[in-house]
Amino acid sequence: MTIETLRVELGERSYDIRVGSAIIGTIGAVCRDAVAGRRVAVVTNTTVGPLYADGVVDSLTAAGFTVLRIDIPDGEEHKTSVTLTSVYDELIKGGLTRDSLLVALGGGVVGDLAGYAAATYLRGVPFVQVPTTLLAQVDSSVGGKTGINHPLGKNLIGAFHQPRAVLIDVDTLATLPQREYLGGLAEVIKYGVVLDGKFFAFLEQNVSALLGRDRQTLVRAITRCCALKAWVVEQDERETGLRAVLNYGHTFGHAVEALTGYTAVLHGEAVAIGMVRAAVLAEARGHSSAGDTRRIRALVEALGLPTELPSFDADSYRDVLLRDKKARDRGLDFVLNRGIGGHEIVRIENLSEVFGICGVGE
């Protein structure tokens, strides 16, 4: 299978995204091109490590690197300052210097936490993303957002720190649990809804192939998602404008995650719920049609994702939403779809109106 290569153009911080099958063994060559130093720390977790870390370490060693492996616990509940400190401890004891490299091997939690460690250790060291979940491959591994959660909210502590490269091997999706795989499809849908109507139609036409994890279909879908993400990041790296569109579905999504303790509902499942709420809100405010909302809901359901908000009272949702990064002095910014393939960011002051439209607290 051909390797698809995309370029994220950010001046001196530009980097390549490589997407393909059976390419994880090229990580040594990728890292050799990325840094002058020859010490690497591979940050992975206790689930991904036994599956792929040995091959990554072997490739890095063959490329001339001295490799330190750091395994962290698996799960969103471990994306914390406690886990981050344990990574710092290993980097310090391992003698990594400013020209050393971190490799993030895993899903979004590993990528976000290892990326934040790279952004802050010795005031910044380079890192490479090797995402092994669909959600991380199409979203969190590209664009330089790194961070950890706080007990009062998700991703409240973080930094922008671009990777030196992103290496996406679709073969790693073969070992991904079904629920996590389906959660990743929510982020795939997101790109079609707010950025590319033709891509949304492609997803509608390829539901069976996506559910069957067809490699060719996945390479095509992941490559398109990464191309769209790169286009957005190139124009708005620090999320001062356009990049906020990538938060479609995340306003209610983050609230669902927080209210369920970051464990009962996966991130992708929460985003799926949030996208359907955003579509309902967009229709009510005249930005899209009932037919658009039906198509969005139908695709979410066809790909095995939830659509209904968990039953918490309106005050609970209000408290969490007002701690959201998208909250402003006067209201909350909602990313709404304009039809399918377009978007609009709307500031809404009256959350009671939103709750009534979206069925919050019912």
From Swiss-Prot:
Its pathway, per UniProt, is: Metabolic intermediate biosynthesis; chorismate biosynthesis; chorismate from D-erythrose 4-phosphate and phosphoenolpyruvate: step 2/7
Residues that coordinate or bind NAD(+): 74-79, 108-112, 132-133, 145, 154, 172-175
Keywords, in A-Z order: Amino-acid biosynthesis, Aromatic amino acid biosynthesis, Cobalt, Cytoplasm, Lyase, Metal-binding, NAD, Nucleotide-binding, Zinc
Q: Quote the catalytic activity from the record.
A: 7-phospho-2-dehydro-3-deoxy-D-arabino-heptonate = 3-dehydroquinate + phosphate
Q: How is the cofactor bound?
A: Binds 1 divalent metal cation per subunit. Can use either Co(2+) or Zn(2+).
Q: Which cofactor does it need?
A: Co(2+); Zn(2+); NAD(+)
Kindly give the CDD domains that the UniProt entry links to this protein: DHQS
| Molecular function terms from GO | 3-dehydroquinate synthase activity; metal ion binding; nucleotide binding
Q: Which SUPFAM superfamilies match?
A: Dehydroquinate synthase-like
An example GO BP is: amino acid biosynthetic process
Q: Which residues bind Zn(2+)?
A: E187, H250, H267
Q: EC number(s) in its UniProt entry? A: 4.2.3.4
Q: Tell me the protein family, please.
A: Belongs to the sugar phosphate cyclases superfamily. Dehydroquinate synthase family.
Task of the protein: Catalyzes the conversion of 3-deoxy-D-arabino-heptulosonate 7-phosphate (DAHP) to dehydroquinate (DHQ).
Annotated protein name in UniProt: 3-dehydroquinate synthase
Q: What would be the name of the gene that encodes this protein?
A: aroB
